[in-house]
Amino acid sequence: MLVWMPGNEKAKNYATKSYHNVKQLEGDKVELLPSAADVMRIVPEYGKELNVAGGYINWGSGWADAAAGVRFAKKLLDEQGKVVFKTGEVDRLLLADSQSATSQRRVTGVVLTDGTTLTADLVVLATGAWTGKLVDLRSRAISTGQAVAYMRISDEEQRRLENIPTVLNFANGIFIIPPRNNLLKIARHAYGYQNPKAVPIPGGNGVTMQVSLPENGVPVPLEGQEAFRTALKELLPSFAEREFVTTRVCWYTDT
């Protein structure tokens, strides 16, 4: 569900255009919520303190537990015994000496930071926010860190909120995800944080380039935590001052 706040005409206009765009694709699955009362009809669990002016909900979309999905897929692979998992950090790609008809050198494998070499007939990179280190994506994509925080909730709060839609305020990119295991997750996808690093240009004979790369284990800066508190005061006021049990910066590569 995408919502806009009172008095924010820019956010309202964006959400309205988004509604009409999605409506063309999803038809009756998309429902306009032109007033705060309409929003409350969809998420009464948020309470009367919910400070929104309107929005829309797409009943054809939803939230998926990515971690649970990966665990399930890994379990199936382990049961079949057809896939070998090797863990390590990739330092660079291995490139064929000769070029193809398209003047591009074929990737034949990877070199890990410990010097181990892995080769394959077909190399598929699913490297997410680390891709910019291995492939020159300058002017095409950039890795940014986005804020994520968790707070502990009671059993009663878990039952009350566990089936709510994901609520997104597109004016600031902050969204609240249905809680699982007594943890409420709030996150933001906006311009994000950058972590500039100098790395060798792939195939560049030692010449370096500056790209933004992930930094593991970094908590959300104070700016991000304060933004979450402000958003919670509008969406879930009773949670606004509750302690975050953990925060982290989650990295993405976007065009």
Language-model features: locations:
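Short beta-strand to alpha-helix junction loop
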Residues: 6-14, 56-75, 217-226
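Helical element adjacent to the flavin cofactor pocket in flavoenzyme catalytic cores
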Residues: 55-122, 126
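Active-site substrate-recognition segment that forms the wall
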Residues: 118-125, 129-255
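Alpha-helical elements of Rossmann-like donor-binding domains used by nucleotide-donor carbohydrate transfer enzymes
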Residues: 17, 38, 72, 89-92, ...
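Conserved hydrophobic/aromatic beta-strand scaffold that supports enzyme active sites
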Residues: 3, 109, 148-150
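A structural signal for short hydrophobic beta-strand segments in well-ordered beta-sheet cores
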Residues: 4, 92-94, 176-177
